Amino acid sequence: MERTYAASPASVFNAWADPQLRRLWGTPSEDVEIRNDAADFRVGGEDIQSCLVGGEVVATVVGRYHDIVADRRIIYTEVISEAGVLLGVSLVSAEFLPSGTGTRLVLTLQTVAVEGSDLLEGVAAGWSGALDRLAQQLDAT
């Protein structure tokens, strides 16, 4: 997936790195709320997020950071589960490339679904919605 934003690579990277900002744009739609249960943005650090719909937890995502280069790249894994049952694992790579006065974001996802055949489509659709919401968040700042 690729998107171009009118903000600098540093601004787009910061929106990704700051857990409070990411909570605002990281949802696939306005129907989903993200709760940050833990946030440790560093190589080896772990984020734990609960995805809520109507106040009920529908999924838990545990992320572990493997590579962070400020304003350039983030590589991490996400373990996705529901009620303690593993649904899948994603490898996520986000590259922040200068593009004129803005940023071209290149997001590469590799997801393995363990349970639930709709997980792959859900992950892709969720990221697409989140990246659209990131544009709105960047425009608001």
What residues fall within each predicted segment?
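Hydrophobic beta-strand positions in extracellular immunoglobulin-like domains
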Residues: 5, 109-111
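Aromatic-glycine hotspot motif
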Residues: 1-10, 66, 97-104
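Hydrophobic pocket/interface hotspot
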Residues: 12, 22, 47, 65, ...
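Residues at helix-coil transition
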Residues: 17-18, 70, 132, 139
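Hydrophobic-ligand binding "helix-grip"
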Residues: 23-24, 28, 37-42, 48-100, ...
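Hydrophobic ligand-binding cavity/cleft-lining segments
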Residues: 1-32
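A conserved amphipathic terminal alpha-helix motif
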Residues: 111-141
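Short helix-to-loop capping/linker segments positioned immediately adjacent to catalytic or ligand/cofactor-binding
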Residues: 1, 82, 117-119
